[in-house]
Amino acid sequence: MKNLLLLLIMAAALLAAPAQAQRPADLWYFGQQAGLTFGPAGTTPAPLNNSKMTTFEGSAVASTAKGELLFYTNGTTVWNRQHRPMPNGTQLMGSGSSTQSALVVPDPGSGNIFYVFTVAPQGGRDGLRYSIIDMTRAEGLGDLPRVNLLLIQPVAEKLAAVRHANGRDVWVLAHRWNSKMFVTYLVTAEGVQAAKPIMSSVGSLNAGPGRNAIGALQFSPDGTKVAAALWRETNKFEVYDFDRTTGKVSNARSFGPYPEAYGVAFSPNSQLLYGTCNGEGGGNSQLWQFDLRTKDGSPTLVGKSANRKIGSLQLGPDGRIYVAREDNPALGVIQKPNDAGKACTYVDEGIKLGGRRSKLGLPNFVVLP
């Protein structure tokens, strides 16, 4: 009986180990040298004070499956795990003032190659590009053998990624500027399929003054939906269906107007959408919830911020949604994002950043349904 019990315990430990080991989004670097590290379930993330990066908006972080830092970037500079700029990693063509300036996609066929996608600010001519990081170089600290490879130009400040339905490859999604066109690129073990983009004409026109390019793009945790915030003149949130097999975007639903719509994030169960807006010129920071099970979205104002501006939303590994508060030493937190209405419990000063400050952005990650 004792031997049987021991075998059962060992089997349970072996089954649990892979799930526990997959922690690629446990480290966040963002804002004014701010950071967070997420621990076991039920614990509060702890602030990090070792970042060398300042970014007004976007950032991205690469970690091992165990949550060990590899590198981070604001779309212009890449810092290695020793918090030093990588060789050839200081002139990427993103921008710390682009909503989603950077996104890191691991090569599906290699544990050593990573692709850093960048988007220019305000529909600028640098467009959507990618750079290649090889972690076998520089004595394991990483280097960039190729940088700033152009995919398409111009684009909005929107950049998101989700795992393919095959469970291996990754779709990278952006939006053309002066267009209704989403553009999707597949990343496989053979690399970025740059010559074979998937085009989807759906939803609102992304055009006008450069500031209209502002606003985030985010996939739902189950990968079936994608949401966008359209800033200023457009002033709305949109939700679309996404096909993880074909890379196609379809069936737009619009909610608005919400002046200066900026950030979007889905609840862990993918049924509720959250969006931030600040009012024309800022000063009226609001957090809205939309129930995607209803026809009109049942829009509910679930929180206001004492901060003049709030920005990006990001679902954490702990199942809570974090809210960037511009120039503030604390993030807002949606404590129960699966709960409809104000039961979701928004806390404006939800977590302190250890003396560092948030800007408008939070790190961008590949969604892994």
Tell me what each language-model feature is.
Residues 22-369:
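Beta-propeller fold recognition
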Residues 1-25, 260-262:
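Bacterial Sec-dependent N-terminal signal peptides
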